[in-house]
Amino acid sequence: MIPLSQKNLVEIRKHSLEDYPNECCGIVIGLAGSVDKDILFRCTNIQNKLHEMDPKTYPRDAKTAYNIDPRELFGIFNQIDSKKLVLKTFYHSLPDHDAYF
């Protein structure tokens, strides 16, 4: 289990409530072995856009799926590389449905 600061746990909960009824998604990065200076990124869930463009390939909408904007991912991973940080976790909410896999 990845430890997260209380501040980031509160922020993730807030994010999920604000994006409801859609899934929220985000990424936490920081220094290895520490949670004090972790950086939380709220990411854009582009699942509805993908579903509208191609419902056959993307049959689920943002109420039951998430897909992070690749430009945001690129920017976050650039920060990881340039600042010598590590990826701590991806997060997303599960509004009104269970985890399934």
Functional labels for PLM-detected ranges:
Residues 1-86, 95-101:
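Conserved beta-strand-loop surface patch within small alpha/beta domains used
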Residues 89-91:
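Conserved catalytic cores of phosphodiester-cleaving nucleases, focusing on short active-site segments
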